[in-house]
Amino acid sequence: MTKKVAIILSNEFEDIELTSPKEAIEEAGFETEIIGDTANAEVVGKHGEKVIVDVSIADAKPEDYDGLLIPGGFSPDHLRGDAEGRYGTFAKYFTKNDVPAFAICHGPQILIDTDDLNGRTLTAVLNVRKDLSNAGANVVDESVVVDKNIVTSRTPDDLDDFNREIVKQLQA
C-alpha cells in the first residue's frame, strides 16, 4: 500500500513550503492529502497559490496517514486559532506514536499544541524559536533537524535539505 502524507493547511501558507515538499513527496511515489477546515474549499497562499482541501479536519483520521507535513507562512497561526484545538490534536497523534511529522518555518508552532516538545530538539524560523523553547524544546539554528520522528526546518532556503530528509524518513 502506498504511504500517504497529511498536509494541514489554511490560507496564507508560504506557497513554496507547500509546493516544494509536496512535489518531492509525490515524486518519491507517495500520496498527499490536503486537510483543512472544509473539504473542497479553496485555500490561497501568501503569493497566490491556490489549492483545494481534500479532507476536512472533522473527517480526517490521523491513523490513516504515514506522515504529517506542516508548511509555514501564516497558515499555522490560523490553524492554532481553531477553537476546538483540532489541528494540535491531529498533530499529537504523530508525535506520540512515532509517525513522521515534518514542519518548516512557522509550521512547528502547531507542534507546541501537542504538549510533546519537552526535551525534543527542533528548529524553525527565528520568530517562532522562543515559543518552541518555552514549550520545552531545545532549539537550534540548523537547516534541518531530526529528533526521532520530528523533522523541522527554518525557511525556504532550507527546502532542499528538508525535502531530502522527508523522503528519507518516508522510505525508512
UniProtKB/Swiss-Prot annotation:
InterPro entries: C56_PfpI-like (IPR006286), Class_I_gatase-like (IPR029062), DJ-1/PfpI (IPR002818). Gene3D superfamilies: 3.40.50.880. Signal peptide: none annotated. Pfam families: DJ-1_PfpI. Residues 3-171 form the PfpI endopeptidase domain. NCBIfam families: PfpI. Belongs to the peptidase C56 family. This is Uncharacterized protein SH1084.
